[in-house]
C-alpha cells in the first residue's frame, strides 16, 4: 500500500505528488489521460498570478497583497472565501523558487501581454513545458505514475478514504488527494447546468471546451452523491469568448481573441450588447464567454479597424477582412444594413479623448446604450476585421468545500485523510468571474498544501499501526 494516492494529472495533482514525495511519502499518481495528453487543462496555461512587494526577475514594479485581493474581490463580486483567497495570494509570492527547483522556468511576457507584466509570471514554453518539467521531476523523485487510469469511484468509511476504484482494480492508500478537474468536458452535465433558454435553445450545445476532454466530473459527482460538502454554482465557470472555428476540445490558448476592448462586439442581429471597455482585458476577458452564451445562437462578432492592429496579441488564425463595413458584414453573415447602422451609431457616440490602452483612458461614448467607457474610438480606418466568437469553457466552479488544510468536508467536519486541490475546489476562491493566472495560483497553492497534509496523514497512520 502506498502512503499517498493522487488522482489527477494536472498542475494541482503534480504539486501534490511532488510535495508529498518531498515529505517522505511513497506516492502513486493516477492520470486518466494517455501519456501524450497528460496534464489536464494545465498543458494549455501560460502564466501564474503572483503577489510581490518589489520587482522580481520577470515581474516588474510591485503587486501587493491588498491589490491582488481587491482585484479578486471585484471579479468575483465578493463571491469568495477571504481567508482562503488570502492564503492563495500570500502563497503565490513564495512558490516560484519551489517551481524552479522542479524545472519550471519563467520568461517576460510577450509584447501583446505587457499589461500583465506586473501581476503575472509567464512560463517558459507555456503550460506544456511546466507539465513536462513536473512529470520529469516526479519520475526522478520516485513518484509512481500510471496513465490511462480513470477512477470512477472511491471507497469511503465515515468520511475517510479507504480505496479508489479504477475499472476492476481496487487501489488502497493511507491518504488521498483528489485533483481530477471539474466537469467542463461533460457536455450532458453542461447542458443540465445551463438548461433551455427563452428562445428554446440549449446554450451548452454551442459551447466549445478550451481544454482537456478528460475532465468529465466523474469523481466530483461521486463525492456529491457520497455526501461531501459542496460549494459553488452549477452554472458558474471560467468561460471565455473564443474563436468560433476552434476545435471542440483542446484548442487551448491559441483560440483566444484579445481585441474585444479595442472595438465593438455585436450579436447575430448586428446589435451591441455590453460595454467592451469596462476594465482592463485580463480582468474582463473571462466574462465574455457567458455574455456570448446569452446571445441568440450563442455567437458574437468582435469588430475592429486597422487602428487596433499592434495593440493586442494577434489571433493565431486571421479573421474576416474587408475594406467596407457592408463587405465585412457579408463575410460574417450579418445583415449589412443593420451592421452599418450599429457601427455608425457607435462612431457618432465616440467622444474625443486621449487613447491609451495601458490605462483606463478618457475615450468613451456619449448617449449610447450600452456605453463603451474606455478605449472608444470610431471604427473608420479600413481595412476592417471581424472574428466570430463562441463560448469557450475552461473549467467549472462547482466543487468540494475545503479548509486551509485542503481537507474534504462531510457535514462540516474535515476528513482525516482525504484532500482536494485544483479545479475540484477552486469554487472556494472563485465563486464567479476570473482574472488571468489565478487558476494556476489556486492549483499550485492547494496542490502543495494537499500534498503535505496527505503525507502527514499517512505518517500518522503508519505511527498508529506500529504503536
Task: Indicate where each model-derived feature is located.
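Conserved N-terminal/central alpha/beta ligand/cofactor-binding core
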Residues: 26, 32-144, 150, 189-192, ...
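Glycine-rich loop(s) and the adjacent beta-strand/alpha-helix scaffold that form part
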Residues: 171-242, 449
Amino acid at each position: 500500500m502506498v502512503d499517498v494516492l493522487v488522482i489527477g494529472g494536472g498542475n494541482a495533482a503534480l504539486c501534490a505528488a511532488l510535495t508529498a514525495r518531498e515529505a517522505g511519502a511513497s506516492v502513486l499518481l493516477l492520470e486518466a489521460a494517455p501519456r501524450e495528453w497528460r496534464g489536464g487543462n494545465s498543458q494549455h496555461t501560460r502564466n501564474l498570478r503572483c503577489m510581490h512587494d518589489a520587482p522580481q526577475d520577470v515581474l516588474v514594479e510591485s503587486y501587493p497583497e491588498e491589490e491582488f485581493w481587491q482585484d479578486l474581490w471585484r471579479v468575483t463580486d465578493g463571491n469568495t472565501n477571504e481567508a482562503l483567497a488570502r492564503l492563495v495570494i500570500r502563497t503565490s509570492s513564495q512558490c516560484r523558487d519551489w517551481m524552479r527547483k522542479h524545472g519550471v522556468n519563467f520568461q517576460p511576457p510577450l509584447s501583446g501581454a505587457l499589461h500583465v507584466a506586473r501581476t503575472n509570471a509567464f512560463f517558459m514554453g507555456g503550460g506544456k513545458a511546466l507539465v513536462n518539467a513536473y512529470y520529469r521531476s516526479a519520475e526522478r523523485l520516485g513518484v509512481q505514475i500510471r496513465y490511462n487510469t480513470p477512477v470512477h469511484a472511491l471507497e469511503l468509511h465515515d468520511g475517510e478514504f479507504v480505496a479508489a476504484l479504477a475499472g476492476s482494480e481496487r487501489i488502497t492508500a493511507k491518504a488521498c488527494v483528489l485533483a481530477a478537474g471539474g466537469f467542463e468536458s461533460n457536455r450532458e452535465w453542461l447542458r443540465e447546468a445551463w438548461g433551455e433558454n427563452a428562445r428554446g435553445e440549449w446554450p451548452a450545445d454551442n459551447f466549445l471546451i478550451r481544454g482537456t476532454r478528460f475532465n468529465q466530473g466523474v469523481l466530483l459527482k461521486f463525492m456529491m452523491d457520497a455526501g461531501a460538502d459542496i460549494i459553488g454554482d452549477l452554472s458558474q465557470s471560467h468561460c471565455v469568448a473564443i474563436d468560433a472555428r476552434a476545435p471542440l476540445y483542446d484548442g487551448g490558448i491559441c483560440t483566444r481573441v484579445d481585441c474585444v476592448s479595442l472595438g465593438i462586439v455585436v450579436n447575430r442581429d448586428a446589435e451591441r450588447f455590453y460595454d467592451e471597455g469596462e476594465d482592463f482585458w485580463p480582468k474582463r476577458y473571462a466574462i465574455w464567454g457567458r455574455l456570448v452564451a446569452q446571445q441568440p445562437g450563442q455567437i458574437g462578432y468582435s469588430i475592429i479597424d486597422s487602428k487596433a492592429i499592434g495593440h493586442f496579441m494577434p489571433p493565431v488564425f486571421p479573421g474576416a477582412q474587408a475594406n467596407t463595413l457592408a463587405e465585412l458584414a457579408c463575410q460574417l453573415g450579418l445583415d449589412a444594413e443593420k451592421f452599418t447602422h450599429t457601427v455608425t451609431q457607435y462612431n457618432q457616440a465616440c467622444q474625443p479623448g486621449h487613447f491609451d490602452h495601458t490605462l483606463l483612458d478618457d475615450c468613451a461614448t456619449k448617449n449610447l446604450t450600452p456605453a463603451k467607457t474606455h478605449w472608444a474610438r470610431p471604427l473608420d480606418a479600413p481595412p476592417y476585421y471581424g472574428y466570430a466568437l463562441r463560448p469557450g469553457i475552461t473549467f467549472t466552479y462547482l466543487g468540494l468545500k475545503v479548509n486551509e488544510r485542503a481537507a474534504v468536508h462531510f457535514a462540516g467536519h474535515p476528513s482525516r485523510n482525504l484532500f482536494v486541490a485544483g479545479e475540484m475546489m477552486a469554487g472556494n476562491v472563485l465563486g464567479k468571474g476570473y482574472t488571468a493566472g489565478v487558476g494556476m495560483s489556486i492549483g499550485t497553492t492547494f496542490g502543495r498544501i494537499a500534498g503535505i497534509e496527505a503525507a502527514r496523514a499517512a505518517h500518522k497512520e503508519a505511527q498508529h499501526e506500529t504503536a
